[in-house]
Amino acid sequence: LGFTAQDLIDHQERLEAQANEAFPYHVDVCTHTRGYVRQLIYACKTCGGGGVCMGCSVSCHSDHDLVELFHRRHFRCDCGTPNLYRHRPMTPYKQKTGYPEGAKPCSLRLHDSNKGWDIPNDENVYTKNFDGQFCVCQRGQHYDPETEKEDMFQCLVCEEWLHESCTSLYPKGATKPLISQDDFDTMICNACVRKEKTALLQAYLGQPGWLVVLPNENGWEVVGS
């Protein structure tokens, strides 16, 4: 259909530029009214695992246990919606209202017609990252940014976070990474390259401007330039 891997990267860069222009990191504005957009998201473990925008992370959840997820595409702020409390146990009250007892409206939307409350965000997608779990390894199941010593990268396609060593950029026992961080701006993980719906990416493996780490008889090698 005339769609290339470079188109994917160009589209992502346009989304980032639009997001930075639309949401210039204002902490006094909730982005909920803008709908499903690509933006910086924080998962609130205190409230129940929903995701909130930067403004709400500061104005409504500043003293809560937050997980910084960085950019998420097609996501609407959960503050003031039932999604914010998605992990809270079901009670008669929650079954009737959609909210647990003690739930609070979004403080940045109190003057809106719904007084800071809103309907569920049915299109939001929640990965394990929202529960504070990252990467595909055992270490990532209990991720702590205060103690994590290894660099992590976010896949352009699935937006999952992976340890440098888990992408084979830094094989076990190596003294330096196979590909320096100075040599790339974007990463696409192995799982996304192998998916049928993104198979077009495989045509670019090893092409100019597309570095790929592949296994060989001695371990790993870098193909491309």
Region annotations inferred by a language model:
Residues 1-225:
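PHD-type zinc finger and closely related Cys/His-rich zinc-binding mini-domains in nuclear regulators
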